């Protein structure tokens, strides 16, 4: 099986004050990479890691597009994409968000303001990921791991304990916040719809649409809470089903007193197979 992975982790942001920087995203990217090589047969050369200044929107989209092209040509049959960063919301760009009238987006290193919103040239919008992951061939298995969030509405006191920080950045102005604060985030289910001719991607997400993912301190270092417990669970049992994996990650989050609840969006058959296995 020819495998490739792209692991992205962004702690520092070129145009944001240090108060908005994160601590555990680079560790997340490196930990997912190490997991893939130690447990799932990836070679070091199979994995691209983009962190901080390397992870501009242009570089991440270029890397994803190249991997999609290689998958479409049949050169690879397994692709893992992990992303740890801030999430945010921007006004709906194309009118497809009938419910919440906002697009979910992921902050890249070069995130910058454009009026009352974040510049779409510096964030990756959920619609862009959906376009990338639509029309993939049936022979290509895609697993997406997102340790980020798109809503601040679920913040609780636990999210502000010492050593914890939410992975959410609101719009840059009060008017921008007003434009999306009544939105009802619906999550990223569109990412897994795929197409009739291809296999839908498998999506692991750090939390429910109305919750906040935590950047936290574990045993002397920082990680995303979701990534930390995901990696621990897969090290303990690499062959467990995806459904079982979700249960173990959720158990870990509860034990750590994190309010977020991990999510798995995948076809029914995929949930009964292990991470990295087709169905």
Pin down the residues of each PLM region.
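Cysteine endopeptidase catalytic domains of the caspase/legumain-like
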Residues: 1-279
């Amino acid at each position: 099986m020819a495998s490739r992975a792209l692991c992205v982790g962004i702690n520092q942001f070129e145009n944001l004050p240090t108060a908005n920087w994160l601590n555990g995203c680079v560790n997340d990217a490196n930990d997912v990479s190490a997991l893939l090589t130690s447990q799932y047969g990836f070679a070091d050369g199979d994995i691209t890691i983009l962190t901080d200044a390397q992870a501009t929107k242009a570089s991440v989209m270029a890397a994803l597009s190249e991997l999609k092209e290689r998958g479409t040509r049949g050169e690879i049959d397994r692709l893992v994409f992990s992303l740890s960063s801030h999430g945010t919301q921007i006004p709906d760009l194309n009118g497809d968000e009938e419910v919440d009238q906002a697009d979910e987006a992921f902050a890249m290193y070069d995130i910058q303001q454009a009026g009352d919103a974040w510049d779409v040239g510096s964030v990756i919008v959920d619609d862009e990921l959906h376009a990338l992951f639509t029309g993939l061939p049936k022979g290509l298995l895609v697993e997406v791991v997102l340790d980020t969030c798109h809503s601040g509405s679920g913040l609780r006191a636990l999210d502000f304990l010492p050593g914890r920080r939410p992975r959410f950045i609101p719009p840059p102005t009060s008017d921008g916040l007003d434009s999306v604060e009544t939105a009802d985030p619906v999550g990223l289910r569109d990412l897994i719809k795929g197409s009739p001719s291809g296999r839908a991607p498998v999506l692991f997400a750090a939390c429910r649409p109305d919750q906040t993912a935590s950047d936290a301190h574990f045993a002397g270092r920082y990680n995303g809470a979701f990534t930390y417990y995901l990696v621990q669970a897969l090290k303990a049992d690499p062959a467990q089903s995806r459904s079982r994996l979700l249960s173990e990650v959720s158990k870990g989050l509860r034990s750590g007193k994190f309010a977020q609840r991990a999510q798995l969006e995948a076809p029914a058959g995929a949930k009964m197979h292990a991470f990295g296995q087709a169905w």
